[in-house]
């Protein structure tokens, strides 16, 4: 299955669960302490990242979705740091502050890409009354299209059955990242996302895929779930639904540096996708692609819609399609080694029309490979003003990547692609319109490197602005 990217601006998700603050202290180490046989780390870098349910919310917000987060914190400095970080990322925080408990904090000491030690500051929340967290959930349910319950067994989901019932009353789907072997407490949820270890803790050792499917269907029936998404590490994921064939999704991970927070990414992309109207199977395929990206990063990480678009368009494997700058530079080097002529152009391409297609076909005919550099949303807004772009970056790139004339699509955030072009240095740089060669961004750098710059004509009568004005005027 090759899913299409939804418009995550339309997603709205309530996340309830165990929030925590992940702190990273990092630096070089070159000696052993004289006090004990341990390395001495000279701390040069300190990072703070939301973890647990907060990481789920951060992932949804990073995609452009509306994330409303409810959880338990202390009245302390880590709670303030967590709230400040999340709100800067446009996550709406509605925490229950309990002065008798510390905010859950995990401090990791890192050196040379390795974790040397983890220090946990926590006292799991217990015997907390249901009313404060349930009332916050009730207030948020009217404005969301999906609920995620993120369970790290730290106490925030002590009243999880009440939470499931509240969501079911208003027909909002409930997705749960479970913890422990007691699936009874999650009875009635829409979908659970156990990893293989968690799944086998409940059902026993799984012999093969047929056994996994059979035992999974038993779990669905026994606990009144609608579905299970079993994450299986290097074997990918398996989606099991009531009275439907299983869907096995192979892993898309290329390199695994750190699985921290990968489960959070899976459930966040899954819930955000369903909340935009995506069917469950397509949402799971998107979550699988997202997991393949984040395990290649260190620590709890988010991903952008551009990274997700790259993953689902297969650019990492095929070498073509939507691609990042570093990958593009590598791909161009390989193309040159094959003796191929690389052509590059750029633009906003907000509403792709016949004039664009004609222009890109012409550009592609001038060489063997065509790169299209695309202005990001912020760049378009600065150039075109309020109300633009009509289509977000990921969608504009997806449409361009689907054209037969285009080999690579890459985003840039500056007002001009001069820096990007000077890094790529194509054999031929082309631009549409009535530009003078000397006024084309990146042209001087391409010519200095021995390349060419050309201006191509646009097809008369075709323009994005004209299309927008025609729509406003009601003309067909």
From Swiss-Prot:
Residues 1-319 are annotated as: Ribokinase. It is an enzyme of class 2 (transferase). The keyword Nucleotidyltransferase applies. ATP binds at residues 195-198. SUPFAM superfamilies: Nucleotidylyl transferase, Ribokinase-like. GO terms for molecular function: ATP binding; heptose 7-phosphate kinase activity; heptose-1-phosphate adenylyltransferase activity; phosphotransferase activity, alcohol group as acceptor. The active site is at 264. InterPro entries: Bifunc_HldE, Carboh/pur_kinase_PfkB_CS, Cyt_trans-like, PfkB_dom, RfaE_dom_I, RfaE_dom_II, Ribokinase-like, Rossmann-like_a/b/a_fold. Pathway: Nucleotide-sugar biosynthesis; ADP-L-glycero-beta-D-manno-heptose biosynthesis; ADP-L-glycero-beta-D-manno-heptose from D-glycero-beta-D-manno-heptose 7-phosphate: step 1/4; Nucleotide-sugar biosynthesis; ADP-L-glycero-beta-D-manno-heptose biosynthesis; ADP-L-glycero-beta-D-manno-heptose from D-glycero-beta-D-manno-heptose 7-phosphate: step 3/4. GO terms for biological process: ADP-L-glycero-beta-D-manno-heptose biosynthetic process. GO terms for cellular component: cytosol. Pfam families: CTP_transf_like, PfkB. Residues 344-476 are annotated as: Cytidylyltransferase. Keywords: ATP-binding, Carbohydrate metabolism, Kinase, Multifunctional enzyme, Nucleotide-binding, Nucleotidyltransferase, Transferase. It comes from the Bacteria. The keyword ATP-binding applies. Its EC number is 2.7.1.167, 2.7.7.70. Homodimer. Catalyzes the ADP transfer from ATP to D-glycero-beta-D-manno-heptose 1-phosphate, yielding ADP-D-glycero-beta-D-manno-heptose. In the N-terminal section; belongs to the carbohydrate kinase PfkB family. In the C-terminal section; belongs to the cytidylyltransferase family. This is Bifunctional protein HldE. It comes from Aliivibrio fischeri (strain ATCC 700601 / ES114). The gene is hldE.
């Amino acid at each position: 299955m090759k899913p299409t990217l939804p418009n995550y601006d339309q997603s709205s998700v309530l996340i309830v669960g165990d929030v925590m603050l992940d702190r990273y202290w990092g630096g070089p180490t070159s000696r052993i302490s004289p006090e004990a046989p341990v390395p001495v780390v000279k701390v040069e870098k300190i990072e703070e990242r939301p973890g647990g349910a907060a990481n789920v919310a951060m992932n949804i917000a990073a995609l452009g979705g509306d994330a409303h987060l409810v959880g338990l914190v202390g009245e302390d400095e880590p709670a303030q740091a967590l709230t400040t970080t999340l709100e800067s990322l446009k996550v709406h925080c509605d925490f229950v502050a309990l002065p008798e408990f510390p905010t859950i904090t995990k401090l990791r000491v890192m050196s040379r890409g390795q974790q040397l030690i983890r220090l946990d500051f926590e006292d799991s929340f217990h015997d907390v009354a249901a009313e404060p967290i349930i009332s916050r959930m009730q207030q948020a349910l009217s404005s969301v299209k999906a609920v995620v319950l993120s369970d790290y067994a730290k106490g925030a989901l002590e009243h999880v059955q009440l939470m499931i019932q509240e969501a079911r009353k208003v027909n909002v789907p409930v997705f749960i990242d479970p913890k422990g072997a007691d699936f009874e407490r999650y009875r009635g949820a829409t979908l659970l996302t156990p990893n293989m270890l968690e799944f086998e803790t409940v059902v026993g050792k799984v012999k093969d895929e047929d056994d996994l499917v059979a035992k999974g269907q038993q779990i669905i029936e026994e606990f009144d779930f609608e579905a299970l998404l079993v994450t299986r590490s290097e074997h990918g994921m398996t989606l099991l639904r009531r009275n439907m064939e299983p869907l096995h999704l192979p892993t898309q991970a290329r390199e695994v540096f750190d699985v921290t927070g990968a489960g959070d990414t899976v459930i966040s992309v899954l819930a955000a996708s369903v909340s935009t109207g995506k069917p469950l199977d397509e949402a799971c395929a998107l979550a699988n692609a997202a997991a393949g990206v984040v395990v290649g990063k260190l620590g709890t990480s988010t991903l952008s819609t551009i990274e997700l678009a790259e993953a689902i368009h297969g650019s990492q494997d095929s070498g073509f399609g939507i691609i990042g700058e570093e990958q593009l530079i590598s791909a161009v080097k390989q193309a040159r080694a094959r003796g191929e002529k690389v052509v590059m152009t750029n633009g906003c391409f907000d509403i792709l029309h016949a004039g664009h297609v004609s222009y890109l076909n012409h550009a592609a005919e001038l060489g063997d490979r065509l790169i299209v550099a695309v202005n990001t949303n912020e760049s378009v807004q600065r150039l075109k003003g309020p109300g633009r772009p009509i289509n977000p970056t990921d969608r504009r790139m997806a449409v361009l990547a689907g054209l037969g004339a285009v080999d690579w699509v890459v985003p840039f955030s500056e007002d001009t692609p001069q820096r990007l072009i000077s890094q790529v240095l194509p054999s031929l740089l082309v631009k549409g319109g009535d530009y003078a060669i000397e006024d084309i961004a990146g042209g001087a750098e391409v010519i200095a490197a021995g390349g060419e710059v050309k201006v191509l004509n646009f097809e008369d009568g075709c323009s994005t602005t004209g299309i927008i004005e025609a729509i406003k005027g009601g003309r067909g």
